[in-house]
Amino acid sequence: MSRDWLCRRLRLSPRQSYSLVRSGYGPCVSSDAVLSLVNKSRRNIAAPFDHVPCDILTADELAQTPELAESGFVPRDFLVFTRRENPNNQPPFLHLNKQTTRFVKSLFLDWLAERAKDAERTGRRRFV
């Protein structure tokens, strides 16, 4: 991937990108190097990032985002999806890749809204 794209995505300066991702000094960076760096940041092995894009947040990190922190919970159903290797009923936009959960935030919120409507119609709670 392009180093410029990485800088825009993680909100880094070019100098920071070279000091953090040392995979060569060319214009490209491997996605494995970025994933490794983000996971080290998650485990407090490396300094935490100021900004991690929403599509590589884990479910626990997502719970800390302002939109879901206001509601006070991440649905247990969704946490189960993220912890199973081969979920049978996962949302179509969810992909598991090692320790990173990749999804589009707007699709996730639409999925939650749709599930909430189904629960209201049937009279049973799907979450918590």
Regions inferred by a protein language model and the residue ranges of each:
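Short, charged amphipathic recognition helices of the HTH superfamily
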Residues: 1-4, 55-64, 75, 89-90
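General secondary-structure propensity
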Residues: 3-6, 108
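Major-groove DNA-recognition helix of helix-turn-helix-type DNA-binding domains
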Residues: 8-36, 65-101
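A short, Lys/Arg-enriched interface patch at domain edges and termini
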Residues: 28-61, 65, 105-128
